Amino acid sequence: MTQQTVLDKIRSLVLPVLEEKGRELVDVEYRREGQGWILRLYIDQPGGVTLDACAEVSREVGVLLEVEDPIDTAYNLEVSSPGLDRPLTKLEDYERFAGRLAKVKSRVSIDVDGKGRGRKTFVGVLAGLSEGKVVLELKDKNGFRMEIPFEDIEKANLEIEF
């Protein structure tokens, strides 16, 4: 089973448990760390995630995963809030966090200054969506507005502003 297949299976198992309690699955990671494997769930809920909420989800999901057994190898389950630098994984996230500073990594190089020097990583203020494209006001280009097709985004997360 590929890692993507494992992640998809975990998402399909976990989503109903979270949605039943009004919680959101922000992201899922399954990776080798140190001597073993970690299955990490990032969750959110209105008003923020508490330690009690993480513990409750860990218990409920832990029992579910014991029964369903979607992963062949031994692993540790961790449940966490997404943090201040939360990943942006859904199209709605870019609308929800409009006005916030974000770092966006594109799958393809984009030439923003017309000099033929494309780049893939951009930091700017999220300005919402336009026809399925993420609108970003670049911090290093005096607010230059650019659009990146959602499907071209490899990774994105909120940035902590100081």
Curated annotation (Swiss-Prot):
Keyword Cytoplasm: yes
GO biological process, one term: ribosomal small subunit assembly
Keyword entries, A-Z: Cytoplasm, Ribosome biogenesis
Cellular-component GO terms for this entry: cytosol
UniProt similarity note: Belongs to the RimP family.
Stored PANTHER family: RIBOSOME MATURATION FACTOR RIMP
HAMAP family named among the record's database cross-references: RimP
Protein name, per record: Ribosome maturation factor RimP
Species name: Syntrophotalea carbinolica (strain DSM 2380 / NBRC 103641 / GraBd1)
Gene name, Swiss-Prot/TrEMBL: rimP
